[in-house]
From Swiss-Prot:
Family label: Belongs to the major facilitator superfamily. TCR/Tet family.
GO molecular function: transmembrane transporter activity
UniProt subcellular location: Cell membrane
Protein name, entry field: MFS-type efflux pump MFS1
Keywords assigned by UniProt, alphabetized: Cell membrane, Glycoprotein, Membrane, Transmembrane, Transmembrane helix, Transport
Biological role: MFS-type efflux pump involved in the modulation susceptibility to azoles, including fluconazole, itraconazole, miconazole and voriconazole. Also confers increased resistance chloramphenicol and thiamphenicol, suggesting that it acts as a pleiotropic drug transporter with a broad substrate spectrum. Finally, increases the tolerance to cycloheximide when expressed in S.cerevisiae, but not in dermatophyte species.
PANTHER family listed in its UniProt record: MAJOR FACILITATOR SUPERFAMILY, MFS EFFLUX TRANSPORTER INPD-RELATED
Amino acid sequence: MTEKDTDGADGLTKAKSNAVSEDYETVNHVTGLKLAVIVTGLCLSVLLVALDNTIIATAIPKITDQFHALEDIGWYGSSYLLTICAFQLIFGKIYTFFPVKWVFLIAITIFEIGSAICGAAPNSTALIIGRAVAGIGSAGIFSGALIIIAYSIPLEKRPAYTGAIGGMYGIASVAGPLMGGAFTDHISWRWCFYINLPIGAVTILSILIFLKHPKQKLDNNQTWKARLLKLDPIGTAFFMPSIICLLLALQWGGTKYPWNNGRIIALFVVFAVLISGFIYFQIRGGDSATVPPRILKKRSIASGAFFLFTIGSAFFIMVYYLPIWFQAIKGASATSSGIMNIPMVLSLVVLSIASGITVTAIGYYAPLYYVSTVLTSIGAGLLTTFTTETSKGKWIGYQIIFGAGVGTGLQLSIIAAQAVLPLEDVAVGTVIMMFCQTLGGALFVSVGQNVFTNLLVKGVVNAAPGLDPQVVLRVGATQLKNMIPPQFLDGVQVAYNDALTKTWYVATALAALSVIGSVGMEWKSVKGKKIEPAAA
């Protein structure tokens, strides 16, 4: 590995680059039927995670009817997101210092236990606990699937498989409410969780049997205590409660408590103090930090994380609030509104796979960032033009444009991280990207909820004077035509349409802001070359 024609710093840099190249060459690359089984198992694991993000949405009315716990509605979703966000970054360190295969299998097992608790929950508290447990497992599944891809497939072929996994994530995210409605209407809401058990079992078996232990740089002479200390316990002690405080403030602010309430202010203050402590210890911690500064300083990592934060946030706003438009304005049932989302699903999946194949063919991923930003921004902007009379052709066409934009860009940041980082840093880089996507979705779905609720209340006061806005909020979108007096219905639908389209302004702004990440991305090729670490 010594370079005879160089010395000093240049020689050291070149030697490090060669070492990185050898890391990629000595990975246990998988081919043939074994690869097909592993990738299928990984896609199913991502299906589990993405489904659980949204499948409960259409089941909540039946759950609250059974448990008589209307006040717990917010916790059914937020308990899952809280533990995902709190544990996602720490999984990056765990995947770095412990065997990838076993960490992934443990994450799926935790998720399965949480799903079983949810399915068998005798009361609302048990359901919330089950959701939190499932969230812990979920925090390590999606990133783990991408890390296994990195260890199993050569870099130049990896984008196509990453695109397939991204497509599966998109399918499940949008199809979740549809499946939740179908299970709730025709079987039981409990099957929203029981369905995870056989799917997870298939994933566990496929990985357990067919995946060999990837060749990681693990120091097997280290004690478990020494490895645990490398997980940055001090940083984690600051990070986890900071994220919980932030998400609780956004969950409760403007709904359970007014924004100027002491509890909300205190949560934001505690978040600011704790996250400042976390940042301080990350800077001091160097390579031992949960988020090593040298990784975050790489242009492609910072730009890719920002891009995924904005595009992911825009996507989740549409996933949550577009079905409400179909229910409130078009009178669709929960199941039918999911079917009406199919144009977005199909375009997202097709473009996600196509963009992965394109990167594999041409080698460069940076140009597709611009395509994603443009299409997503145009699609989101067109969706904000909806009225109560919007035709079928428009709501289908606009969804296709938006879905195509999101599908093109959803997996690009993962590809970028794997292209610019040495293999031993891929786990942390991948988790940083996934964390930004998850956190963005959690934050801006809450922001969207506050924007929507406040505008709907004002809209009902103006468009349907004489009707109590709180009645409209309690009724829900699917029951408007049955529960709202006929003389108020047109005004309420106008108020709903106005509140939803203005909520989508947030998604449009986020999609437009993603251009910052696109412009900052380095032009690196994944084709026909050995991968060297990017300059910090």
